[in-house]
Swiss-Prot record:
<dbReference type="InterPro" id="IPR036373">
    <property type="entry name" value="Ribosomal_bL17_sf"/>
</dbReference>
<dbReference type="InterPro" id="IPR000456">
    <property type="entry name" value="Ribosomal_bL17"/>
</dbReference>
<comment type="subunit">
    <text>Part of the 50S ribosomal subunit. Contacts protein L32.</text>
</comment>
<keyword id="KW-0689">Ribosomal protein</keyword>
<dbReference type="GO" id="GO:0022625">
    <property type="term" value="C:cytosolic large ribosomal subunit"/>
</dbReference>
<dbReference type="InterPro" id="IPR047859">
    <property type="entry name" value="Ribosomal_bL17_CS"/>
</dbReference>
<dbReference type="GO" id="GO:0006412">
    <property type="term" value="P:translation"/>
</dbReference>
<protein>
    <recommendedName>
        <fullName>Large ribosomal subunit protein bL17</fullName>
    </recommendedName>
</protein>
<dbReference type="GO" id="GO:0003735">
    <property type="term" value="F:structural constituent of ribosome"/>
</dbReference>
<comment type="similarity">
    <text>Belongs to the bacterial ribosomal protein bL17 family.</text>
</comment>
<dbReference type="Pfam" id="PF01196">
    <property type="entry name" value="Ribosomal_L17"/>
</dbReference>
<keyword id="KW-0687">Ribonucleoprotein</keyword>
Length: 128
């Protein structure tokens, strides 16, 4: 299996990819290095495909990978309560239905100027 090491041990690399994947699902666009963007593209595409399947097994597989972070909060004045949506809920309720008619290619990578300081090639990865 071909993958990039990204200058980290395997556990650090897996944790970083999980974090970046979750951040992309929450924010729908992030700025990172080109190598990281190309790596998280694989995992995000898999998560959206699981979201499109939508069954219990797919939800559990996605829950095992995506971090349990709050994607959005809203306040309901009528009931005087806050409601929050996690990244997993957003994946299955908002993102996956958006790509119901699309077979892959859910992300776009746009190259930007090199990072100041170490001139690392930077990119913006976003959901199409």
């Amino acid at each position: 299996m071909a993958y990039r090491k990204l200058g980290r041990t395997s556990s650090q690399r897996k944790a970083m990819l999980r974090d970046l994947t979750t951040d992309l699902l929450i924010n729908e666009s992030i700025v990172t290095t080109e190598a990281r963007a190309k790596e998280i593209r694989k995992t995000v595409e898999k998560m959206i495909t699981l979201g499109k399947r939508g069954d219990l097994h797919a939800r559990r597989q996605a829950a095992a990978y995506v971090r349990n972070e709050i994607a959005s909060e809203s306040y309901d004045e009528a009931t005087d309560k806050y409601t929050s949506t996690t990244a997993l809920q957003k994946l299955f309720s908002e993102i996956a239905p958006r790509y119901a008619e699309r077979n892959g290619g859910y992300t776009r990578i746009l190259k930007t100027e090199p990072r100041r300081g170490d001139a690392a090639p930077m990119a913006i990865i976003e959901l199409v």
